[in-house]
């Protein structure tokens, strides 16, 4: 509540100074702070000299605004003193604006710029935490930052200088481009006691902002957070590597966290999730290599996967690992069955069914115990932490001629489920959650389920 009151008082003081400029435009350049002691009475001069020492000591601690006038019942002297006081503060204000490299138009149009930003839907929150005591490392007297050498300056003028610096930083950073705002910060407030943090992070600037924010949290106590919520600027806050890994889900909205550490943690979690998804997709991709028809259908459904392969070197390594595992999955069942054509169809269907269950039913209950250790190795490569044992291909419900008749329906349904799961994981990957789908085998409802998934696939491509 106290910072809000101080902020309102500072705005009123600035408006009063602007009114004084409009009335007396040419008298501010010739006045010096030493003219305050030239009062007609000795009592007033002694009081002001004592007030100067008090103001010097309080400039290092908390800010305060004091208007103390021990003047006799002479209205002319009192009005003269107040005018000199305001003109001196205005003189220091113009010097501070020249030192910052900004034009005086920023100060005059400050209220107009705030209204313009509010009309665009930008929300600003300014939190000022200031504690008493000596200034920390990097904290200086605000009047000394502006290049003012004479001592004995009023606390109200120091506070107005600080507020003007704060608003010049905040508004120029929001109204002008990023390069202009960075130039203004380097000239004026690189060592000031205020740290401005905004969430309009550009991709080539994010590492520097992160480093500066961690240093400022350790060195400063006066923190001013100016946050701007805008959907287009939030989407540009992604790293280039993060955009490459999540380009397939570019329609997702990534909510920027309050803490940069939490944001980096979510990046690593999403990265690991996408690596697991790529393991599963590559393992399922190459397990269907024994049929040219399945390769054609799979190539239709994995155009997005090929983009991810061209953008990252991790995907090519995953493809090599998954290729070795999937070839073993196809050749080992075909060697154990001792029947040439019919056995190859059964082994292909069983391996594809196991791949589907390993990819979807990671936490499903499967009571069948596999006699091949290569399936558990592939399942560890896909999921990383799951402990599911794949079912035995000999116990699968495809035998004899039924396997020949149902192979086309099962592969079509598996392909539909594969594309459905890939799109679902791309959409929900930013939230850090895994979609777990347990699918039971029913011979009567195979065609109905495949048709239903084909109907559900269409909204995912939009």
UniProtKB/Swiss-Prot annotation:
Protein modification = Transglutaminase substrate. Rapidly cleaved after ejaculation by KLK3/PSA, resulting in liquefaction of the semen coagulum and the progressive release of motile spermatozoa.
Q: Which residues carry this modification: Pyrrolidone carboxylic acid?
A: 24
Residues annotated as region Interaction with EPPIN? Answer: 164-283
What GO biological process, any one, is recorded here?
negative regulation of flagellated sperm motility
Q: How does it assemble?
A: Occurs in disulfide-linked complexes which may also contain two less abundant 71- and 76-kDa semenogelin-related polypeptides. Interacts with EPPIN (via C-terminus); Cys-239 is a critical amino acid for both binding to EPPIN.
- Annotated family: Belongs to the semenogelin family.
Q: What is this protein called?
A: Semenogelin-1
**What is the protein's species of origin?**
Homo sapiens
The beginning of the lineage is: Eukaryota, Metazoa, Chordata, Craniata, Vertebrata
């Amino acid at each position: 509540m106290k910072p809000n009151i101080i902020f309102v008082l500072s705005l009123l003081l600035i408006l009063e100074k602007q009114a004084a400029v409009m009335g007396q435009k040419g008298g501010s350049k010739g006045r010096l702070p030493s003219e305050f002691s030239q009062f007609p009475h000795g009592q007033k001069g002694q009081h002001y000299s004592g007030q100067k020492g008090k103001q010097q000591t309080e400039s290092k601690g908390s800010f305060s605004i004091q208007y103390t006038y021990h003047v006799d019942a002479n209205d002319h002297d009192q009005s003269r003193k107040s005018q000199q006081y305001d003109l001196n503060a205005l003189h220091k204000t113009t010097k501070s604006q020249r030192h910052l490299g900004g034009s005086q138009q920023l100060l005059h149009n400050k209220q107009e710029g705030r209204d313009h930003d509010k009309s665009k839907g930008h929300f600003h929150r300014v939190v000022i935490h200031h504690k008493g005591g000596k200034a920390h490392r990097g904290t200086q007297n605000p009047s000394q930052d502006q290049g003012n050498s004479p001592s004995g300056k009023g606390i109200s003028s120091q506070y107005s200088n600080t507020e003007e610096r704060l608003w010049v930083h905040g508004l120029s950073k929001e109204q002008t481009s990023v390069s202009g705002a960075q130039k203004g910060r380097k000239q004026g407030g690189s060592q000031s006691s205020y740290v401005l943090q905004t969430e309009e992070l550009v991709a080539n600037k994010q590492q520097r902002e992160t480093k500066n924010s961690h240093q400022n949290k350790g060195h400063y106590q006066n923190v001013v957070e100016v946050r701007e919520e805008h959907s287009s600027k939030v989407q540009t806050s992604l790293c280039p590597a993060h955009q490459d890994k999540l380009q397939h889900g570019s329609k997702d909205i990534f909510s920027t966290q309050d803490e940069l550490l939490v944001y980096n943690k979510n990046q690593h979690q999403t990265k690991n999730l996408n690596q697991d998804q790529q393991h599963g997709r590559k393992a399922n991709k190459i397990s269907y290599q024994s049929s040219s028809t399945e390769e054609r259908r799979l190539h239709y459904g994995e155009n997005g996967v090929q983009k991810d392969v061209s953008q990252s070197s991790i995907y090519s390594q995953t493809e090599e690992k998954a290729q070795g595992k999937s070839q073993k999955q196809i050749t080992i069942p075909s060697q154990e069955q001792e029947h040439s054509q019919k056995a190859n169809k059964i082994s292909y269907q069983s391996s594809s069914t196991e791949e589907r269950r390993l990819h979807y039913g990671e936490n499903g209950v499967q009571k069948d115990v596999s006699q091949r250790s290569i399936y558990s190795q592939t399942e560890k490569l896909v999921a990383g932490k799951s402990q599911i044992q794949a079912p035995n291909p000999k116990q699968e419900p495809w035998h004899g001629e039924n396997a020949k008749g149902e192979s086309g329906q099962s592969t079509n349904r598996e392909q539909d489920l594969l594309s459905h799961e890939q799109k679902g994981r791309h959409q929900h990957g930013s939230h850090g959650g895994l979609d777990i789908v347990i699918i039971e085998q029913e011979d009567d409802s195979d065609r109905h389920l495949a048709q239903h998934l084909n109907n559900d696939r269409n909204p995912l491509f939009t």
